[in-house]
């Protein structure tokens, strides 16, 4: 009687079990299968019987009991579990120590060479996707759905990491930035938002011009290279107020890049000022705006937007506003809010619409997946996203958005620990020091309000990557005491 192999994932180069670089097999003797089946039917499982029947010492067997998965991740139920008559949780408890693993012929496993490593997928749906990734061919909508559906998340991450390293090697970017939110008064009343307040709400605020400038100065202790400015859709503030905020910042901090106003805000300001979007953008440029952030995109699917943000511009107007900005020479980012009421198809649709616009304009620099934080929102009955969902989203984004230079793991939303792991799942950017982030903390985020350059570098280096400080346009930044120079 032959041996039945059990695949065991062995991880190297990444904390814990988040990057399958080597796959080997342990052989298990099926001789005691009948006895195990009988006991399994009665929910009895004797570890001594099992270890003795498989020529594993009792002490060695006990050392193998872990809570990690030891079956091919592409299968909902391990095939070997059925042949041995084991229940799912019993099979999950069996792992062979790495030191005792035997290498066998891997020819039966699908393999693709990536440099000195090999990709092996236990999910057959990933095979054609892997072939496309190797050939640097574009993935389809169906490929995207398969990536979301696959149980072999480690293989999905492996592919995304391959693309990431092909584009950036080990380089991982961060910047020293300061968030400024001039007002939280907003007419949109989005169900996904814990930041906005109605006019007259005691918790609402609007900064005076001097307060906005002082806020910027208070975050200048590390010589920031970027001001990130977003806020609510205030029903009364004139367009001129926002132009004055920008002019004052540019006058006081001429070297700092100003990344200001989402596509939603720009469309709103244009309506308030009775200007076209193009005219609005030109006035913002004249005042000192250098680029735009990517917020407000949420999910483009009309069905979802009608529930979570029905008073915002729709997905098509968001894309059209971005198109106009890019055609005027502005660079911008793009986001997607996930983990609420959307489905995998909505996510794929969102990503492919961004990809199509990037084909046309080339104006996007970075894609930032944003995990929904339900606390303090009308959707607080929804669960928070899991770490597995977060790292899968990073990986799928990297694989589908082949024309986006960068994928950001926004540590404020994902937590620093998950963001660090994401650096092995396709992300090449951690965002920055941030300093006093409000929007996601109002939604219950418990991450720090900011991080130092030293802390960000530690996260990156511990992940086996090389930290590179950048400015907003991804030029390398060199520092000397409290000053900096940008390599353009």
Residue ranges and their predicted role:
Residues 42-44, 75, 88:
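Short, positively charged and aromatic/hydrophobic N-terminal segments
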Residues 197-335, 340-357:
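Conserved Radical SAM active-site core
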Residues 23-40:
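Short alpha-helix boundary/capping segments
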Residues 172-178, 227, 258-260, 292-294, ...:
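Hydrophobic faces of well-ordered beta-strands that scaffold small-molecule active sites
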Residues 166-168, 172-211:
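Canonical Radical SAM [4Fe-4S] cluster-binding loop centered on the CxxxCxxC motif
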Residues 91-154, 220, 352, 358-488:
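Auxiliary Fe-S-binding modules of radical SAM enzymes
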């Amino acid at each position: 009687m032959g041996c039945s192999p059990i695949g065991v994932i062995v991880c190297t180069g990444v904390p814990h079990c988040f990057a399958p670089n080597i796959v080997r097999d342990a052989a298990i003797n099926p001789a005691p299968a009948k006895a195990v089946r009988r006991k399994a039917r009665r929910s009895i499982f004797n570890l001594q019987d099992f270890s003795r029947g498989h020529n594993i010492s009792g002490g060695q067997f006990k050392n193998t009991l872990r809570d990690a998965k030891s079956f091919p991740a592409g299968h909902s139920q391990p095939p070997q579990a059925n042949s041995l008559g084991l229940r799912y949780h019993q099979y999950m408890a069996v792992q062979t120590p790495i030191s005792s693993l035997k290498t066998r012929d891997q020819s039966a496993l699908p393999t693709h060479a990536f440099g000195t490593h090999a990709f092996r997928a236990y999910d057959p749906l990933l095979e054609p996707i892997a072939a496309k990734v190797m050939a640097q061919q574009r993935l389809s909508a169906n490929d995207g759905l398969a990536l979301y559906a696959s149980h072999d998340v480690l293989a999905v991450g492996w592919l995304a990491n391959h693309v990431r390293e092909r584009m950036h090697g080990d380089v991982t970017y961060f910047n020293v930035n300061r968030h400024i939110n001039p007002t939280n008064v907003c007419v949109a009343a989005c169900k996904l938002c814990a930041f906005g307040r109605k006019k007259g709400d005691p918790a609402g605020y609007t900064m005076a011009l001097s307060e906005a400038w002082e806020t910027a100065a208070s975050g200048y202790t590390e010589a920031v290279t970027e001001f990130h400015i977003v806020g609510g859709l205030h029903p009364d503030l004139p367009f001129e107020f926002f132009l004055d905020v920008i002019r004052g910042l540019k006058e006081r901090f001429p070297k700092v890049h100003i990344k200001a106003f989402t596509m939603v805000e720009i469309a709103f300001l244009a309506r308030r000022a009775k200007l076209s979007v193009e005219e609005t953008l030109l006035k913002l440029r004249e005042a000192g705006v250098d680029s735009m952030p990517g917020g407000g995109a949420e999910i483009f699917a009309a069905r979802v937007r009608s529930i979570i943000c029905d008073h915002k511009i729709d997905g098509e107007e968001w894309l059209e506003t971005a198109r106009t900005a890019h055609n005027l020479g502005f660079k911008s980012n793009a986001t997607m809010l996930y983990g609420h009421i959307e489905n995998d198809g909505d996510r794929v649709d969102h990503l492919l619409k961004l990809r199509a616009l990037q084909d046309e304009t080339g104006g996007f620099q970075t894609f930032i997946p944003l995990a929904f934080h339900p606390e303090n929102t009308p959707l607080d009955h929804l669960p928070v996203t899991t770490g597995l969902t977060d790292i899968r989203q990073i990986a799928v984004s990297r694989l589908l958005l082949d024309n986006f230079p960068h994928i950001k793991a926004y540590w404020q939303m994902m937590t620093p620990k998950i963001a660090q792991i994401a650096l092995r799942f396709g992300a090449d950017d951690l965002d920055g020091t941030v300093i006093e982030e409000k929007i996601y903390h109002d939604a219950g985020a418990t991450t720090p309000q900011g991080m130092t350059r030293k802390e960000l570098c530690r996260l990156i280096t511990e992940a086996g990557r090389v930290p590179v400080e950048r400015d907003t346009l991804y030029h390398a930044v060199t520092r000397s005491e409290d000053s900096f120079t940008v390599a353009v």
